[in-house]
Amino acid sequence: MLNLGGPALAGNPDAGKTKAEQKCAICHGPLGLSQNPGAPNLAGQPAIYLVEQLRAFRGGKRQHQVMSIIAKPLNDDDISDLAAWYASLVVSVKQPQ
């Protein structure tokens, strides 16, 4: 059973986009598609998953040299907004011919 302790999906994607441009794009790409092999793609990920991961980094349950520092000052609204933004991005795959 997954309990995130509050509204996880009520974020504002527009606010999330602004926050992502400031805090996330350098590693995860401006549209959540990373060119950095050490940073995962975030575009199209389920909001509930992103909320859980950001809260884990913020709370110290999950450790990463960069993400732990970035997530620490995020409040629940920041996390919900970021999750809503990345979850709203549609990822399409071009099939090889």
Question: What are the residue ranges of the model-derived segments?
Answer:
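Sequence/structural segment immediately N-terminal to covalent heme-attachment motifs in c-type
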Residues: L9-L31, A43-Q45, Y49, K94-Q97
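N-terminal hydrophobic or amphipathic segments with adjacent small-residue motifs
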Residues: L4, A10, K23-I26, G38, ...
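C-type cytochrome heme c attachment motif
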Residues: E21-P30, P40-N41, E52-R55, D78-A84
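C-terminal capping alpha-helices of c-type cytochrome domains
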Residues: L2-L4, I48, Q53, R62, ...
